[in-house]
Each structure stands twice: as C-alpha cells, then as structure tokens.
C-alpha cells in the first residue's frame, strides 16, 4: 500500500490549487459557512492524494467512512469524491447506509413480531443489506453502458423517495464510497454487554430484547457487506455526548435546507433528536472504544469541528 502523503508535499499543494474553487463551491451548496482552509489542505487533499495513489486495478476500490451521527462522514466523503473527480480525473460514486433502510411497512412488521422499537430506523436490523450488496455488485461488475440505480431516502418522510427520482450511475467507477454510522462495526461481545444504558433502554427495552436482536442482526449479513471494504476510515469524536449535540446541529442544518413547508413540519426538536440518538448509543459507545484499533484510517474530530489524523496507513 502507498505511503500516506504529507499535506505539505508538492503533489498535495498542486492538487489543492486544482480543486480549491470546486471544494468551496460545494461547501457553499452544503450550507457550510465556517469551513477552514486547513480542513481541505490537511484532511481532504491528503486523503484524496492517498486514494489516487492506490494501485490501479480492474475493479473499484470500496471505501467506508464511518462515524457517529453528525460526525461529518458524509460531508467528508463528498469533498473527497469531488477532489478525485476534479483534481485526479477519477470516477467515483457514493451512497449511504441511510439510503438502504427497510420500508416503514417492513419495520412495522418487525415491531409487531419482535419489539416495538424495531419500527425506528437506524440500528442494525432496520436496513435492507441485500439492496446494499446489489448496488455494490452492479457497480463492481458494470459495463460501460450499465446503469446502476442509487436509492435516495427522505429522513423527514421516513421513507425512500419514488424510484423514478433515484440517481442513475452509468458505467464502472474507480472508487465506491459508502458512509455508515456503524460501517465496519463488530457485534458487541457477551463479556462487553452492559445493562440498559439510557432512559430509552431502561423504560422501553429493560430485558434487552430489542438491543440483543439488533446485535444479532449486526453479526449476520452486515458483516458480509463490511468484509468487502478495501479501506475503513473512522471519524472519532470526543465522546457520546458530542454525538448527541452533533446530531442536533445536523437536524438544524437540515431544517435550513428544506423548502417544502410540509417537510419542515417533520423536523425534530432537540428533545426528539436526543431520544432518537438513544437508539444508537449502545453500539456507538462500543465503536468509539473498539474501532480505532482496527480501522485503517482514524480521523479525530474535536468539539469545535477541528479534524486531525490519529492513524494512517
């Protein structure tokens, strides 16, 4: 594997000059007003340069960006994809674990047969992993004329947008990026299993039926998908409390970007966001403890959105 580049080397400086205008335009489109130059020069560009230096091969590299809700994984992925396209002339496509949720009807069925909390999207067991594998398989084996549909999910509506509005990707990419809050996660081991750890679990899942079901689901088809990653990048945030605040900030940002009044009504308030994140807390805490030891790249993010590399290849 190639050596990870120094952000000050000539290749990185040249790559930034070639992509700077496009990167700042994307930041504006994403409603990110306070992005720093150093985020691009010290994080996005070295990552882009590293991915571009990987050995050429016939099938795409499959790269996962993982991190808690609101950690910035989707945004970082979008910037890297853009820099690869503009600065390196590489073809890339990205999709998210949020794009492959099971339908509300499927989750309602799980809620009736297993536990009421199963109807809430997010935890392992609420995704259509087969759909994710089908997308990956189509992209990996694509011919020049192959069209791969990339699903799109509406968080305010809690269901997929109509299929006719899904993105079409033509041909085979050089890179496939997948962002997932639990990407690469391993099931919580028996010895690390803890009793109910927040209000939601204490009040609605005191016997651990739902949390153990989700952990069992994670041990299944999710691992088949995760084993296909060529590289796993983790964004490590300071603590679980930071995840709560970051997800609330994400909801506020979403509210600013929505134009449809009916969609705006679906935006969660702070109390609703915090309750929502409680569904993820058990596995998120385990990921924060365990994943830095086996992720290929670890990017640390502090409380004021400063990023730095903690681990590189």
Predicted regions located by residue number:
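Loop/turn-to-beta-strand initiation segments
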Residues: 145-146, 172-176, 231
